UniProtKB/Swiss-Prot annotation:
Record note on domains: The presence of a 'disulfide through disulfide knot' structurally defines this protein as a knottin.
GO molecular function: sodium channel regulator activity; toxin activity
Other facts noted in the record for this chain: Negative results: does not show effect on rat Nav1.8/SCN10A.
Protein name: Nemertide alpha-7
Length: 31
């Protein structure tokens, strides 16, 4: 799942996450 680490930050683990408000990442298999 996703682990929130800040206002717009998440640590990705096979899920769609916002990378500290800079870039939106969608990691497989949830692309």
């Amino acid at each position: 799942g996703c682990i929130p680490v800040g206002s717009m930050c998440t640590i990705s683990n096979g899920c769609c996450t916002k990378n500290c408000g800079w870039n939106f990442h969608c990691n497989k298999p949830n692309q």
